[in-house]
Amino acid sequence: VRRRTRLLAWVAIVAQVVFVGGWVLAGALEPHYSAVRQYISELGRHGAAHPWIFVVFIGVWGLGFIALALATVPPLRTRPWPLAMPLMFVLAGVCAILVGPLHMDCSPTVSAVCKSREAAGTLSWHHYAHEWVSLGIKVSLLLTGFAFARSAWPSRLARLVLSGALVLLVAGIVTFVLHDSFVGYQGLEERLWALLAQLWALVCATVLILEATLQPGVLRAHEAASVESHALGEPAAAGVDPA
């Protein structure tokens, strides 16, 4: 189990690297593409130079989240709501895999005609499905933070993660409401959110690797210290099931 956890965590880490490398490569090969102005998804739109690259790297990214979900199952199995966080990672992964074949019709960030048709609802169903499924990735990844906080409650780590998730929720709502204010920088905005998602995945994967590498005796001592700390009324960081 520990070896499998390490392997799955490494798969999740590699997926983050593939994701960044994919949009950098596709962006470099796409004529007149601006990473600051245009969405990552526009690399896979109809008429793009190499839409298959987008399908591949976004699909690998999704598989990375599913691998991370499987890796979190054993450590959380003795915690409250043990499947909440893994299921949210699975949902994010499935959405990422589905979003690849759902190509956008055009580039709403650079084409006024495309933007107008998008607002009028005259584009194809897969264009709008792409947008909603993309939103599903963001929402499900945000919910992983709340799910972890519930599973690890009342540890200090749970409170820290919950605070961060609440801040990101507020920031997400604000940027959604003020979306049109980011005209000219929508690609940069999306990449900043993607970076936060990747950092969260990397933190989770790194913790899983470290915990799976520790000897069982060390883990038992850590859990014993956590229990003693709770008995004294001091919330401790969440431990991990040594299995």
Model segments located where?
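Hydrophobic alpha-helical elements and their junctions with loops/disorder across both membrane
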Residues: 107, 212, 228-232
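Short, intrinsically disordered terminal tails adjacent to the first/last structured region
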Residues: 218-243
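Hydrophobic, aromatic-enriched alpha-helical segments typical of multi-pass transmembrane helices
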Residues: 2-211
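Membrane-interface capping segments at transmembrane-helix boundaries
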Residues: 208-221
